[in-house]
């Protein structure tokens, strides 16, 4: 203000530096790549980093396509944290999470050996374990991780009751479409109300919304500097109206930042192949949005596209 800068929200956060056997600083193979075009939203970042500093489990919820998982991955990429991901859908089984016994051949003889699942492997190292679709997990699966959420370790009953203790720098991040109280909108099939004891094990909750027009414009401009400013504005307006129609119950499909990126990429490719730039954009919208929209949403998508790209 008045030409002066004010230092605010400055605090140290845990970061990791990895070195190979020779002592050279390297990037951990499970650490996500940095996306230089990514736009962090400060209101979410301060909550995320504070939870990380305190060692809390973090719950991030919001509509599909708001970038919940990507947010965690991009934080991890900048602080050197490896990332494990588990999608807690109906196909996930307890053996996938905690591990299972298998028969192997050792010294020519068959023997039973226990192989750790994703959870015990991740718990023993400094990393983020992202539990995608946490509110769609089956009850028996959620109970498998509940003790680990308490920071009391994980008992592997399948391996003689062996206790796995969490690494001090291990963190849980849950992503969900709900606050854990069930589907408030009636749009997300499979979302279940969560056990209150499970929810209580998450210290910080962040409701993630869609990018603002300015934020999305910056991302697209960084990713596609060859794209005309007026075209970027059209794409951003289109995605905004699609999302608003989705949130208002007019559409059963939406578009994520990844989708808007695909739209621009497809448009620029087709623009070089077609004499009519508007036809190239129409082709891009069809390929990325319209052709995957349910029949009850197609006409509404077409109407929005015609208005935004006329």
How should these model regions be labeled?
Residues 1-38, 42-45, 210-217, 221-310:
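Alpha-helical lid/collar subdomain of P-loop NTPases
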């Amino acid at each position: 203000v008045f030409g002066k800068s004010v230092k605010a929200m400055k605090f140290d956060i845990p970061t990791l530096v990895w070195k190979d056997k020779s002592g050279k600083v390297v990037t951990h193979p499970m650490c996500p790549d940095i996306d230089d075009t990514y736009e962090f939203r400060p209101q979410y970042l301060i909550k995320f980093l504070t939870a990380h500093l305190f060692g809390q489990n973090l719950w991030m919820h919001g509509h599909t396509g708001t970038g919940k998982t990507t947010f965690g991955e991009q934080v991890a990429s900048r602080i050197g944290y490896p990332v494990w991901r588990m999608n807690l859908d109906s196909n996930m089984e307890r053996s996938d999470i905690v591990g299972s016994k298998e028969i192997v051949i050792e010294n020519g003889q068959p023997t039973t050996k226990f192989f750790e699942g994703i959870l015990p492997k991740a718990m023993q190292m400094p990393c983020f374990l992202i539990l995608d679709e946490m509110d769609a997990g089956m009850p028996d699966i959620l109970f498998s991780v509940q003790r680990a959420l308490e920071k009391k370790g994980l008992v592997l009953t399948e391996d003689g009751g062996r206790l796995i203790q969490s690494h001090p720098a291990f963190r849980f991040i849950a992503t969900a479409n709900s606050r854990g109280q069930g589907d408030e909108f009636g749009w997300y099939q499979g979302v279940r109300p969560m056990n209150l004891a499970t929810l209580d094990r998450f210290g910080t909750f962040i409701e993630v919304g869609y990018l603002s027009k300015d934020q999305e414009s910056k991302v697209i401009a960084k990713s596609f500097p060859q794209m005309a400013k007026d075209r970027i504005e059209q794409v951003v307006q289109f995605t905004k109206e699609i999302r608003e129609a989705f949130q208002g119950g007019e559409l059963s499909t939406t578009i994520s930042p990844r989708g808007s990126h695909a739209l621009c990429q497809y448009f620029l490719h087709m623009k070089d192949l077609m004499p009519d730039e508007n036809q190239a954009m129409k082709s891009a919208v069809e390929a990325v949005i319209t052709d995957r929209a349910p029949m009850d949403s197609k006409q509404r998508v077409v109407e929005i596209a015609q208005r935004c790209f006329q």
